[in-house]
Structures are given as C-alpha cells and as structure tokens.
C-alpha cells in the first residue's frame, strides 16, 4: 500500500511538473575552448595572490622577504571535464609559478638587500565548480571545492651574502611554500563565487525583447551533469510586458537533446513560439490599418469596383471618402514544427470601410482571412532570428457561400498586399531576433538547424568574442571583500 501511494505521489508530481520551452546542452566538445579561456583567466587571478612577508632571526642574523608577487604561471598538464558530483572539475598538475620578491638581511651592522626571482615547482590544483539555480531562476556557481599544493620552492641567491642566504634558505622556502599553499584556494574560491557569478549575471533571465513583450529564461531545475554533457532546462516563455504575471500553459511536446558532436545544442518547442505569438496578440500588435493613400491604388480601385453597388447608394459626402482596410488577428497564431519544416497558421478578419472625415465609418465588407506562413530559423551570434514567407492564403465570408464566391477576385490583390506591405513589417520585427541565454562575450558559430516532430534543435560551436577578463571586469561587483575567504575545507595546506 505504501509503495502504491508513493507511486501515485510521484505520478502526481510529474503531471504538475512544468515542461521546458527551451533546453541547452553543453557538450564535452566545448571544454577545450572553455579550458583555454579559463586557464588564461586563472593565470591572471593567480597573479593577484598576496603573500605576507616572511621574516625571522637566528642568532644575530635577521632576514625579511617582502613584496612577494606572482609573475607567471607555467602549465604542464591540465584537464577540464564534467563530473556528476562536482559539475565542472579542473585538474592542474606539475605546474610552476614564477615569483618576484624583495630580500633583506642584517648581520650585526652588515646589511644586504635587493630583489630576486624564485619559482614554485610541482604546483597541483584540483578545483570543482558546482552549478545550481538561485531563487530567481538564474544559473549560479553555488560552491567551489579546492585542493592545492606546492611541492618545492627554488631560489637562487647571489651577492656577498649568498652563503648566508643559502644557510637560511630552508626556513625561507618552507615558510613561503606554506603561505603560498594557503593563498591559492581563497583566490580560486573568490574567482568562482564572485567573478564567475558576475559573468553568469549577464545571462538573461526575465528581460524585454522590445517595447511590447519580454522573455522568461528561468531555469526550471538545477543543471544536470553527466560524464559528457551539461544539460539545462529553461522556461522559454514570452509574456506581454503590460501583464507581467501572465502565463500560458505549456502543452507542447518536450524538446529532446540527444546529439553531442557540436559544442552546444539548443532546442525550442512549439510552445516557445506559440507563447511569443500569444504575447504579441495579447499586446494588440497583430493588427494593421491602412487608410487613404496607404492603400495601394490598384487595390483601392478594385475594392471600389467590387463594392460599387453598395457605395453608389451612399450619401455623396461619403462616396469619395478615403478607403480604410483593417487586418486584425482574431486568435493567436499557432506554430507547427515537423521534420519537413516549420509553419505558422493565422486567422484574421479583414474589414473594409469608407472613412469620411468627422463622420462615422461606413462598413462595406468584413471577411475572414486564413494564412499559412513558412518560418525559417537561423541563429546569428546569440540571437535567434526568424524569416517568414507567405505560402497559403484564402479569404471567405462567414455570412454566406455566395458572398465568398464574390470575394474570389480580391484574393490575388490582397495576397499581393500581404506580401508587399505586411510581410516586410513582420520580418523586420522577427529578424531582430531574441537573445539565447548565453553569457556576454560568447557567441554561436557554424550553426545547423534541424527540425523534429514538435521541436527544433540548433547545433553550433562557441566563440569567445570577448575574453573572460574583459567581461568580468565590466560586470565586477563593487564590494566583494566578504567573498575572498573560502570555507575552511576549501584550502589545502
């Protein structure tokens, strides 16, 4: 009985789980590129290590090592890979750090000072980044694990007191090695929890697309990591800006990601596009009104000839009034994605009136228009763009079949009007595109779009248009002092 009840609860939870409208998979093919940029950033961060002065005395000898700074990082072996428990794991072994510091020695009244170069050999670093969603649905680095060790220090002293320095080198090098061990992990913890999170803050969560609608890319759950991929599920829903709490139930097919040859894959369900069209419909954007000289002259003449019998019976003050043509969607358009292509179906009303100045409009006809558009998706940079093309068009009257027959001569000119006057306006808006949830400075290249039953996938490679350092410095938090200190378990002596 208990097992049946648990099964029922599991099924109930699954039934109410929100389906993603957008999925992103980062594959292991992207890790080499990420590692190159990440190691460059890591090298710059390790150069910020601050080592306290090392000083002491033995008998009448006093020594002081100060102004220690890291000058360079040499990597012999490094590996970045996915790991289910740690999400992203970086292993660095047999690396070396170049150091530059000031030396001072006092023996009785004899003093020696100057600057010297040293190296930390056998540097090993093992650090893991754990990714999760925060309360706003944004992806974050929630934890950084770190183990670091330096096996030995090399210093080459010279000058008059070289033998004295060599005598104290054991004390000096062991002290500096201990301090260096203690400083590596705090730097990496700060780099992950503060600096990398400032980069992730550039990923859009709820942002405006234009002055009418916005897009919600909230994560629905924590990222899922396997040995070869990092998978993320986003809400992927548009909404009218004037109705921030508006939502559309997602009953579309859940998009699936199965490939792993390219660096990244993005999948969009029919819901993603349906929510966009529903949002524009709710915002009142799916309508167009042409009055007077905005109506093509050929179409104006044809319409007046078609409805001559009705116009001639009107008042002389109305007969020569400007013609008004209003197209308005009667319901939100719907998207259908098949392996053969993507289509959008739309139903609209076409109202033809005479609009005399300062007088009520006179309706000549009201008809129903049904259209089918083909949609071609492309991804440029990190903007998803759509180009629409009118494939099928018909008009009819919902009053009588006889009136529908009378509308046949209007079908060709109205279709031409849509192709010349309406489609360019739609494509101007859709070609602006909507941003994909990627951090600033990272773009898609070499995109391949593939249609499936109910969803579309885009496979692409990644390109760093900006370096991590450039983006992080631009978005660095003003006060990060509290994040410099990692948990006690993060640093290994």
Swiss-Prot record:
Coiled coil location: none
Glycosylated residues, chain numbering: 64, 91, 94, 117, 143, 245, 398
UniProt GO BP: ceramide transport; flagellated sperm motility; high-density lipoprotein particle remodeling; positive regulation of cholesterol efflux; vitamin E biosynthetic process
Signal peptide: 1-17
Function: Mediates the transfer of phospholipids and free cholesterol from triglyceride-rich lipoproteins (low density lipoproteins or LDL and very low density lipoproteins or VLDL) into high-density lipoproteins (HDL) as well as the exchange of phospholipids between triglyceride-rich lipoproteins themselves. Facilitates the transfer of a spectrum of different lipid molecules, including sphingomyelin, phosphatidylcholine, phosphatidylinositol, phosphatidylglycerol, and phosphatidyl ethanolamine. Plays an important role in HDL remodeling which involves modulating the size and composition of HDL.
Gene Ontology cellular component annotations, sorted alphabetically: extracellular region; extracellular space; high-density lipoprotein particle; nucleus
Disulfide bonds: 146-185
Disrupted gene: phenotype observed: Mice show a complete loss of phosphatidylcholine, phosphatidylethanolamine, phosphatidylinositol and sphingomyelin transfer activities, and a partial loss of free cholesterol transfer activity. Transfer of VLDL phospholipid into HDL is abolished. A marked reduction in the levels of plasma HDL phospholipid, cholesteryl ester and free cholesterol seen, whereas the levels of non-HDL lipids are not significantly altered.
Location, primary (coarse class): secreted
PTM note: Glycosylation is necessary for secretion and its phospholipid transfer activity.
CDD domains listed in its UniProt record: BPI1 (cd00025), BPI2 (cd00026)
GO function terms (MF aspect): ceramide binding; cerebroside transfer activity; cholesterol transfer activity; diacylglyceride transfer activity; diacylglycerol binding; high-density lipoprotein particle binding; low-density lipoprotein particle binding; phosphatidic acid binding
Protein species of origin: Mus musculus (Mouse)
Subcellular location(s) of the protein: Secreted; Nucleus
Gene3D superfamilies attached to this UniProt entry: Bactericidal permeability-increasing protein, domain 1 (3.15.10.10), Bactericidal permeability-increasing protein, domain 2 (3.15.20.10)
Name listed for the protein in its UniProt record: Phospholipid transfer protein
Native organism taxonomy: Eukaryota, Metazoa, Chordata, Craniata, Vertebrata
Keywords: Disulfide bond, Glycoprotein, Lipid transport, Nucleus, Secreted, Signal, Transport
Family to which this protein belongs: Belongs to the BPI/LBP/Plunc superfamily. BPI/LBP family.
Tissue: Highest level expression in the lung, brain and heart with relatively low levels in the liver, skeletal muscle and testis and very low levels found in the spleen and kidney.
Record-linked SUPFAM superfamilies: Bactericidal permeability-increasing protein, BPI
Reactions it catalyzes: a 1,2-diacyl-sn-glycero-3-phosphocholine(in) = a 1,2-diacyl-sn-glycero-3-phosphocholine(out); a 1,2-diacyl-sn-glycero-3-phosphoethanolamine(in) = a 1,2-diacyl-sn-glycero-3-phosphoethanolamine(out); a 1,2-diacyl-sn-glycerol(in) = a 1,2-diacyl-sn-glycerol(out); a 1,2-diacyl-sn-glycero-3-phosphate(in) = a 1,2-diacyl-sn-glycero-3-phosphate(out)
